[in-house]
Amino acid sequence: MQMLYWAQNDSGGTAMLGSFNPWKHYDNYSEQMFEDKTSDLPQWPIKLWQVPEVSPYFHHAHLLIAADCSAFACPSFHEKLSKGKVPLLCCPATDFDIATKLEKIFSHNEIASITVVKMEKACCQDMLEFIFRAAKVSRLPIPIQVTNLFVEAEDVTE
């Protein structure tokens, strides 16, 4: 990957000033590293408010219900928390009625398990209540595991 720098002269013409490769100083850098990456997402969309209430990807699914910001706070989020799960992202502080949407998803699909990832911040405190309420309404014995993330990106599992 190279960045090209162009400049416009007084007469309106342009000339290339040079190029710069911001990655050349990194050890073991290879453009192939980026080309070989593909998404492991089992579905799209991943935002809770956008997903349908009934879908084949929910059948016997291991759900990951995570706060929007959690993936950015934990460097190993994909490898340690979301791999092999159906991700549903939401923000308990700003999203619509999360509990109602989850109640419908849980009631209409056979959910195998739920992993909750939330930040240890005031804005995420209601997240567990929404999920437990939805699971209770669905009357299904869904195992729920909770992981709290701290801003320092240290994760602690309850």
Where are each of the predicted segments found?
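Iron-sulfur-associated redox domains of electron-transfer enzymes in respiratory
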Residues: Q2-E158
